[in-house]
Structure formats: C-alpha cells, structure tokens
Amino acid sequence: DAAALSAFEVVIKSPGISAYASPKVDAELHGVRFTSGTAIWFAENAGAHTVCVTGTKGKSTVTALVAFLLRAAGERTALAGNIGLPLLELLDVQPPPDAWAIELSSYQTCDAQRPAVAVVLNLFPEHLDWHGSEARYFADKLKLVTDAQPGIALLNGADARLREVGNALAARGQRVQWFNTDDGWHVRDRWIMRGGRAVIDVKFLPLPGRHNWVNLCAAMAAVEALGIDPVPLAQPFLRRPHLPQ
C-alpha cells in the first residue's frame, strides 16, 4: 500500500499498476518517485535502433512481422516489450542487436523515448479501469507519437482519429508516414498494394483475414520507413516461390 511504499525513494512500477490510482498516486504525495522497466531500458539504450508498435488490436502480430522482415534483411533483431522478453531483462545485451522490434501497451507508451519508427495501428476503447476514461486511454496510447519524439510516426490513415493526430503532428514538424491509404501500403481486391502497384496476392499469405493483411501492410511500411525495401524480404513468408513482378 501507499504507506509501505513511502519507505522508498524510488519504486519500479509494474505496468499493470495504474498510474492514476492508489497506491501510486497516494505514495507520490509522500515524495515517492516511480519509474518502470520500460523507462529504464530506454534511458540505458538511448542509441538503440527501435521500431515501437502500439495499437488496441494487432500490435503483437505487427511487431513479430517487423522482426521477421528485419531479420530477413540480415539485421540482428530483438523481439521485446509486451512480446518476447521484458525490456528490463535486456538492459545490456552483448553483442547488442542491430535493431529492436518492441511492442508497447498503453501502460508503457508514456515511457518510450525517440524510437526510429513509432507505429500506431488503431484505437478502440480498452483498459478503462487502468486509464480512468476513454479520453485518457487514447491520450496515453498516442504518447508514443505525441511525446516520445520518434524519428517517424507511422499511422493508420484509415483511422479518423489517427488521421487528425497525424495531421497535427505534421503541422508541428514531426515526420509522419501513413499505411492503409491508397498511396501507401494497403489492401485492395485481395492484393497487398504499394500505392498503385500490386505486390502480393493475399491467397499466398499464411495470415487469414483482412485485419491481418492490414497488419502486414503496417509491418512493410515500418521496414520501408527505415530505408529497407520490404518486398523481397517477404519472400520466405509466402506459400509460393516468387513474388509477382
């Protein structure tokens, strides 16, 4: 409880403990400072090459796909955060990975710092008991792009709320890129498209359902945002030998 926590100067908080309720709020009144495994990792790995992914739905799939594609590109890539190993267990990995694919929940997004690419997939009300309100949940989720100072904010252009946020970010100088738009990576007529170019027939994908095809679009866009052509990297993922020309 708050009284017990007041015996400590700094407490490493589990993500599942709400930032907006007791015991954290009450302990802070007694001068206790809180941090998290996520915050510690980013502070200790300020130069890490990270792709951070959040969203109400699909973030585990997209993070895993990003790691798959980067590994196919020859990048030693760690899968971490809300998927794979907890960040606190990866403070001093030797040799360090070339890249990190990190899944972040709404409990963790406020602690990320300067990812190379920050991906927000979608927003639906969730975890309201932790956040206290729908508005606060959305705001906390969006801290990955509004507060974390990403190199590139990659957003779902088909989500009206994310479109509004992205336009506001771009107006203040943030680099913003989009997926799920006609000029980017998107799904059309059972094809994965890059703008007007048909790239992958979805019948060759082991991922069922349109939502997963959009997830693949997000991952392809994230890798592309790093300056890597994702098309040849998807080759081992398909159930046939060659991508269409």
Question: How would you describe each model-predicted region?
Answer:
Residues 5, 131-135, 167, 174-245:
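Adenine nucleotide phosphate-binding catalytic loops in nucleotide-utilizing enzymes
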Residues 3-6, 15-175:
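Phosphate-binding loop of NTP-binding sites
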